[in-house]
Amino acid sequence: MGRGRVELKRIENKINRQVTFAKRRNGLLKKAYELSVLCDAEVALIIFSNRGKLYEFCSTQSMTKTLEKYQKCSYAGPETAVQNRESEQLKASRNEYLKLKARVENLQRTQRNLLGEDLDSLGIKELESLEKQLDSSLKHVRTTRTKHLVDQLTELQRKEQMVSEANRCLRRKLEESNHVRGQQVWEQGCNLIGYERQPEVQQPLHGGNGFFHPLDAAGEPTLQIGYPAEHHEAMNSACMNTYMPPWLP
């Protein structure tokens, strides 16, 4: 069964009246909060109990501003409210413009002072403050420049190390290549010389009395040009025995 209809009249029982007030008050505050959140509405709720105790809820940070807004909308005509709102917006825009204009003028004056212009109107304290500001700016510029130089130097050193390492690797590969190539040339030369020596040892020319004779020197391949020493001695003795001068009879 559904809930029965409650007759709207004052509850005579004091306890029941207080309990009903607490329940309905909490429900009303909850509904006001839900309305402000779900519908993005500006809600203000004011409740006074029969004893004069205040209960309130405001969706904004200030209940006073909401009440002032309510008064302007309630006690002024629609045209007056629109005019007041436009006037307030124009006033706020003008104030913002004046603030920005003053700030721009101040910045321009400071820039001219930093460039050394319009210094006659400055006092001693202002000049000292300007000098400190320039010193601080100069120090910051020098620090930044030094940092950039150090970073560039570090990068150059890193690149130099990379190039040096690459050069060492190339030099090592070149030395290894030259060593391997020299070893191959040496082995080919040894094989070629050994191949040419074998026929001379096995088949000597002219029965061992030829013009070219191999010499054994600790296994090293050598080549002797001409007749051996004993062959020269035999030839000299033969010439001396057979040669006769023309004046002999």
UniProtKB/Swiss-Prot annotation:
One of its GO terms (molecular function) is protein dimerization activity. May interact with the K-box of MADS6. May interact with MADS13 and MADS18. SUPFAM superfamilies: SRF-like. This is MADS-box transcription factor 7. GO terms for biological process: cell differentiation; flower development; positive regulation of transcription by RNA polymerase II; regulation of transcription by RNA polymerase II. Its main location: nucleus. CDD domains: MADS_MEF2_like. Keywords: Developmental protein, Differentiation, DNA-binding, Flowering, Nucleus, Transcription, Transcription regulation. GO terms for cellular component: nucleus. It comes from the Eukaryota. Residues 90-180 form the K-box domain. Expressed in lodicules, stamens and carpels. It comes from Oryza sativa subsp. japonica. Pfam families: K-box, SRF-TF. Probable transcription factor. May be involved in the control of flowering time. Residues 1-61 form the MADS-box domain.
